[in-house]
Every structure is written in structure tokens, then in C-alpha cells.
Amino acid sequence: MSDIIKILIVDDNPAIADTLADILEVKGFTVHAAASGAEALQILKEAPVDILLTDVKMPGMNGLELYRETRKLYPRLITIFMTAYSADELIQQGMAEGVKTILDKPLDMNFLVRLLSAYRRTIAEAGKMAAE
């Protein structure tokens, strides 16, 4: 079992996804990026991850719909919403359905790295690090 956290970033803005991926990789995380919910589901089939970090407002499948789909397939996957619209109804619904962490954009990268690192113990204790 690896102690490296595997993260899937989903954002329809490639600049945001790529920047996040670059920063998190430098910090020691394994990162995949997707530009849509559909692409994220495909990546998850091929490369299991520990944490899903997804934008909420995206064309096609939004972050809440992606959360619902991933929860069916991977019920223990940790999901973090990131949004510029923290009062949005999708955010409120996500929280009601079990999303525990909502991050406002623009993201505080130091806080994000600390948060993701804090999940390392939770993931390891649950014995659910993604398969290598």
C-alpha cells in the first residue's frame, strides 16, 4: 500500500486544472486531471484515486452530478468541491448529500496542501489508498 495520495482534479478550465496538478505534483501527490465529468469517470475506471477535487459549475455533468455517479461506483472516495459560488444551490445540495469539504476559488494553495495531507492519515487508517 502506497502512502502517496492519488488525486483527480476535475475542472472545465484547463489552466486551473493544469496549475493545480503542477503544484500538487511538486508537493508529492500523484495527480490526474480531467476537463469534464465524463472524462473523470473514464479516468477513475483506469486509475483509482483517493480524492476527487472537482469544480461544481461545469458544462455537461456538473460537480454534484459527478459526485453522485462516483458515490455509486466508489462509495468511500473522498470528494472536495471547489467553487466561486459558495452560496450556490448545487453546493448546498452536495453538502446535504455528504460532501464534507467546500473550497472557495481562488484556492489558497497552502491550505489545500495542508488539507490534502491531513486526509493521508484518514485514508491510511481506513485502508483505502488507491491501488497502485
Language model region names:
Residues 18-26:
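Charged docking surfaces used in two-component/phosphorelay signaling
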Residues 42, 64-76:
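Short amphipathic alpha-helix used as the core "switch/output" element in two-component signaling
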Residues 89, 107-117:
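C-terminal output helix
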